[in-house]
């Protein structure tokens, strides 16, 4: 059965500490990746591993930017110009310096994560800002950051030949905040992979389309 705000288990909110932990675990794992693997495909994505990590860093920075203005936009993005380096690549507004290698890319990821952590810690809970998945509060952006970090690290781990199993409590908080209709009963990590179209669950085929809901709950 789906998770319920009234009958389901009580799950703590997503916090800045959760984002900091997820980014730290991601960076630690990526530092051990073989350098030759970064040009290979990232799991089921059409992007390579470098592009996927760069996309993740941009996501984290984008969430921080959305919370930054004195009056954050509720119906659009903060107007930073976007670009892509190839037609099928991710659309981003910052690029890591390729000459700095994978170590530099991981630093960019850490820096973008740190900026979001700071914004989530310091932005009042009543603040709202636009996201395509729903106008979100700081906790909503923290949850989106967890989703992106945990799931794209799955893509990267597949592409780089690494093992990635994030803490169950982080997965539970993402599911409760962004995927309240996700089924109970399975481990949180496989359920999050199912909810984001990465894997099947027993009796539930892999999703072709999916959507998270970052709408502020109050």
Residue ranges and their predicted role:
Residues 90-94:
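Acidic catalytic motifs of isoprenoid enzymes
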Residues 2-28, 32-45, 61-89, 100-218:
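Structured surface interface patches that mediate subunit assembly and partner/cofactor docking
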Residues 97:
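Glycine- and acidic-residue-rich catalytic/RNA-contacting loop of pseudouridine synthases
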Residues 55-56:
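Glycine-rich loop at the start of a catalytic domain that most often binds anionic cofactors/ligands
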Residues 52:
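Extended, alpha-helix-rich binding/interface surfaces that flank or overlap catalytic cores
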